[in-house]
Amino acid sequence: MATEQQDSQLCLATILEDFLKQRNIQVSVGVDSSSLKKADETFGGRDLPVDPSDLRRYEAARWVRNTLGVVGGRDLPADPSEEDFRIALRSGILLCNVLNRVKPGAVPKVVEAPNDPLVNQDGAALSAFQYFENLRNFLVFVEEMGIPTFEVSDFEKGGKSARIVECVLALKSYREWKQSGGSGTWRYILNSKPTTFGIAKQYKRKDSEVPVDAVTNSPSSTPSSEQPLLDQSDSNTKNDGTASSIDAIVRAVFSDMKQEDIPVIVEDMLKSVMVEYERRLATQNELLLMSAGNRDKLGSGDLGRTISGNEETLSDASYGEENVTEIVNNNMEASQDSNVEELENQDYELYAISKEKTEKQQLIIERQQTHTEELKHDLKAVKAGLSLLQMKYQQEFTSLGKHLHGLTYAATGYQRVLEENRKLYNQVQDLKGSIRVYCRVRPFLPGQKSVLTTVDHLEDSTLSIATPSKYGKEGQKTFTFNKVFGPSASQEAVFADTQPLIRSVLDGYNVCIFAYGQTGSGKTFTMMGPNELTDETLGVNYRALSDLFHLSSVRKETFSYNISVQMLEIYNEQVRDLLATNEIRNSTQDGINVPEATLVPVSTTSDVIHLMNIGQKNRAVSATAMNDRSSRSHSCLTVHVQGKDLTSGVTLRGSMHLVDLAGSERIDKSEVTGDRLKEAQHINKSLSALGDVIASLSQKNNHIPYRNSKLTQLLQDALGGQAKTLMFIHISPELEDLGETLSTLKFAERVATVDLGAARVNKDTSEVKELKEQIASLKLALARKESGADQTQLQRPLTPDKLLRKKSLGVSSSFSKSANSTRQVQTKHKPSQIDDVNSIEGQSDSASSLDLQGLVGSPSWKTPPRDGKEEDMEFIIPGSEWVDKHEDEITRSSKPENRAHTQLEKRTSSLKREATRGVDKNKCNSSVDKGLEVRKIPYEEEANESDETATSDCSETNLMWQLNVQVNMPRPASNGSSTKLKKNQSKISRVAAETRSMIPSLIPTPTRTLSLGAAISSPGQTSSRHNNSTVVVKKRQNPK
């Protein structure tokens, strides 16, 4: 019987549990007391959550703590109540920090809480600024992100904290979407169910209550202990473990329910219990009917026991119903009492807390007002100070602005004056003909160990070198040049200063630019560039020709230019053509120094690069200990420019010589042997000869040793005053090269002191050409007309006067061989004027030219005497190419035969007749210096000085090559042998041929216009040509 009653109570508990599950009311039925005690210890006696909103709040709180860390989220509990959650987040600090973790920089400045011990940590009143500023920044940014927001009033008591929780969870969802890759569009969907939480069973109990054992679903389970029900007055024998389980279930269900919901739940619960009991009774009745066939077999005892069992079951059911009703009533009374007491306690606590908060807030407000007054006072003081500082700063800025404006104006004026001074200085240099000297300091090469530099100071035109004691007085040596380029100067900057000089080639001037310095100092880099050429590293040669092409294309409407290029080198005192091997010649009419050398017309920069690459391949280059690409020869790139004015027909001729000298080197440093040693000796010898020429030019000596080296002969016209000359001086900054650096800089100082004279334009106008053609035509006609007289004069016998003329020509030829004899004669006699008829003789390609092969063997002719007082006789000696330009002028005061007769009478009257002729011959030989007159044809300068071409004072070979010498001799008094005259002519031809030089001039031969009056004013002064030169021997008889 007891077992059946126990089963009935167990069924009642099962019915209640199924009912609660249908209503989504979770209650633990199969949890033992130890599990309840463990849960109680885990939550520390706090109220366990029942509502899903609590779970979402816990989830939001824990995410905030995990995001900010233990320190950042220390003010927010892990499982906060609604009040704790609201108080922790009401300042907005945690929310702004979390937002900055999700979106860095969303809230630039978070207003932190004041570090004041008087502020309550459980949510005391904050400052109005902090309370509003943080929340406002958070809500503005969150609303832009599309996250659900809340109101500031939700943080007040009674506010809707659920919106705050939803906002935090939406922010959590956004961060998870962003961490997963952010694919697609993020959208937050409200979810009322908690995601994860560790508590599946939920209940609430008081701290004063003892845990109640639960009843398991297993029918074999028995109650472990018996506990009295709360407020239960009577004791019942059936109050066992099952009743306690039902009591625990009911109390657990009704503990957190509202008072108005309890009757409804109780009514539904009772209905469920009655329905279940009715179902079970019907089942039992069916079982009884099905066993009706067996009733006969049953005994009366058994039937009675069955009836009594049913009655007991019904009684148990009625007892359970009464028990539930009683439990519900007791619970309702207990809950009402406890609620009233709890409400009273809460009211008292709230009143105390409110009072305490009010006092603290009042204190805080008072302190804030005090601080506000202090801040206002400080703000006024700061504003006054700022106004004063602003006024002072304004005054200072105005003063500085005026001063800066003045400095700017002065700097602008200084730059303008500096530019004008530079232009004027360049003009003065052009007028003086001084050699411009630019200095360039080579940078340290990559990989060099030495970092000590000898360059102490460097400015625009000044260079200071630090010198140790072994080079003289320890200190600095300062050098001044036209321009100084530092190690960081680019190729473009170097070319920019030489560009005006290079462009003057198109205007008809001759220009020479050469690089000087020791080996490895960067000469080839400046002139040509490195092996691998780029737009930034192109040398002066490439840039100069590119600029000439560009300028010629700009002027193509007014001028027509023809540009051609030659490349030469001097290797071991031998002149070679880098584009083709030919013999070097002297200057010719068109300015081309090697007539048979390769002269290539160019029109584009690519043509120039191609030719220069060919020349560089042919140039002698070798590696030494000081330089991997040491130039073993002097190279010269010559650019010939011939322009024609399309309007006036004026022809301009200019040439530019870009010379890359081989570097001077010390044998012990370069470590050269064999052929390299021989090359170094020739290089140093030629550079030494260049130094001697510069020294002579700076000292203005009469004799300049150009012929000591092929290099000086090559640069003769550039250094002789016919060209605008510029020298690049290159030095190395290494300390071990200090000796070579000082020597190079001193040489450059001597070069800067040389004055060559102003260069002139090489211009030929159409009028000058016409006059030259007329003069040549008239001279040709005159020569043909008087050719018969010349033939008669050559057939006359040799006389003592002709012997005297032969002796005189021998003396003249000696002058062209020795420069010392020339200087001695110049000190005794006056130099005669020179007329260069090269422009007339240069018309060899026209019909009116004097360069005719038919005049080679034509004899000289006889000219009539002037006024019956002077008899002239010309004798043409062909075969000489030039004679020395320094000849002596000797005049006679009487006729030779009369003077000879007078001298014979004075010396002796007792000489025998057979000795008279020998004495006369000796007298004639001793009177050569008095009886010989070398007269050079004077020229008549043109009216327009700009149309004549300048002649170099130092280019004596060019002038001598164009010179006609006329020697005046007395008319022969007796007949002589014509064979002696022919022998004398051949001797003079050999002497003249010995004086001819094979070294060219870099500058085109200047032309001077021979006036018509000067050419034909004297009928007896005619000449003929042979091999580009003519020696005219003339006898002049002065009146007594």
Swiss-Prot record:
Domain Kinesin motor: 434-754
Coiled coil (residue ranges): 761-796
Positions that bind ATP: 517-524
UniProt-recorded Gene Ontology molecular function terms: ATP binding; microtubule binding; microtubule motor activity
Keyword list, A-Z: ATP-binding, Coiled coil, Microtubule, Motor protein, Nucleotide-binding
Residue ranges of domain Calponin-homology (CH) in the record: 54-176
Start-end of Basic and acidic residues biased regions: 887-923
GO terms under cellular component: microtubule; microtubule cytoskeleton
The keyword Iron-sulfur appears for this protein: no
Record bears the keyword Nucleus: no
Classification via Gene3D superfamilies: Calponin-like domain (1.10.418.10), Kinesin motor domain (3.40.850.10)
GO biological process, any: microtubule-based movement
Family: Belongs to the TRAFAC class myosin-kinesin ATPase superfamily. Kinesin family. KIN-14 subfamily.
Protein name (Swiss-Prot/TrEMBL): Kinesin-like protein KIN-14H
Organism from which the protein derives: Arabidopsis thaliana
Gene assigned in the entry: KIN14H
